[in-house]
């Protein structure tokens, strides 16, 4: 599954927790860069809001977090 598909599934899971505008703002503000792996660009807020995924906060771009 590519990063865009993962992000779309995550977005769908979060759709019930906030408005589309709030989710768009949250995701836009927390992207570290287009070339970064998705698991490194999502912040801890999404970590707390999701299950089944091991997301790393932007500040925790470490080897153990990326693997």
Swiss-Prot record:
GO CC term (a single one): extracellular region
Record PTM text: Contains DL-beta-methyllanthionine, when coepressed in E.coli with the flavecin synthetase FlvM2.
Signal peptide positions (record): none
Cross-linked residues, Beta-methyllanthionine (Thr-Cys): 50-56, 58-61, 62-65
Keywords of the record: Antibiotic, Antimicrobial, Bacteriocin, Lantibiotic, Secreted, Thioether bond
Highest taxon above the source species: Bacteria
2,3-didehydrobutyrine found at: 39, 43
MF terms in GO: signaling receptor binding
Propiece residue ranges: 1-34
Location within or outside the cell: Secreted
Summary of the function given for this chain in its UniProt record: Lanthionine-containing peptide antibiotic (lantibiotic) only active on Gram-positive bacteria in synergy with Flvalpha.a. Is not active in absence of Flvalpha.a, which is encoded by the same operon than Flvbeta.b. The bactericidal activity of lantibiotics is based on depolarization of energized bacterial cytoplasmic membranes, initiated by the formation of aqueous transmembrane pores.
Name assigned to this protein: Lantibiotic Flvbeta.b
Source species of the chain: Ruminococcus flavefaciens
């Amino acid at each position: 599954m590519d990063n865009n598909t993962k992000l779309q599934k995550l977005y769908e899971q979060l759709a019930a927790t906030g408005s589309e505008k709030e989710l768009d703002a949250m995701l836009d503000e927390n992207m570290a860069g287009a070339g970064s792996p998705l698991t490194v660009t999502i912040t801890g807020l999404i970590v707390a809001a999701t299950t089944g995924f091991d997301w790393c906060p932007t500040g925790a771009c470490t080897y153990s977090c990326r693997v």
